[in-house]
């Protein structure tokens, strides 16, 4: 199973936030802003007989306008994936719909937010995409494209997830809390029936 870690791409430029003059200073690489791209590459690998190298995913995002805002618009990139690969795409804010989708063999990209009043950030200090692989009734199995030895050792994060690289395990409650500030939370992908 392909795992793509954005931290391995500090020199791969990602020109995003194009509607507002480009990326913030120091945040113009896949390492800093490519979590959605990494998740998209993993989805294509897992649901099709094709690959989408991260360099090609950067180009796809830029060609389709998924890069017009900070990071990546998964609504735009997901639609592009659906058009170019044999993948069905939709989105929801219902965690139970996302869980049902996983149970049918699909994949879910979740958009989590950062810290806010009453919530200590678990997965990110900003917006961040991660790939949900499965749910066993207690925990999600997750591929976090920004997984590092240090990330979940930070104060406030210790003990809230289990890690067996490259996999991360987290409760439904943690995912719901982490995603609740996002306008669109769960992006559903499945192999298209032929």
Kindly label every feature range from the protein language model:
Residues 1-7, 11, 16, 82, ...:
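Noncatalytic regulatory segments and standalone regulatory/sensor domains
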Residues 1-67:
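Active-site-adjacent structural segments surrounding the nucleophilic cysteine of cysteine proteases
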Residues 31, 36-40, 73, 77, ...:
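Stable alpha-helical elements in mature extracytoplasmic
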Residues 40, 61-68, 92-103:
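Short low-complexity stretches enriched in small and charged residues
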Residues 42-50, 80, 84, 101:
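Structured segments of extracytoplasmic/periplasmic soluble domains
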Residues 64-92:
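Mid-length scaffold segments of soluble, non-membrane domains
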Residues 91-147, 151:
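Active-site-adjacent substructure of cysteine-protease-like catalytic cores
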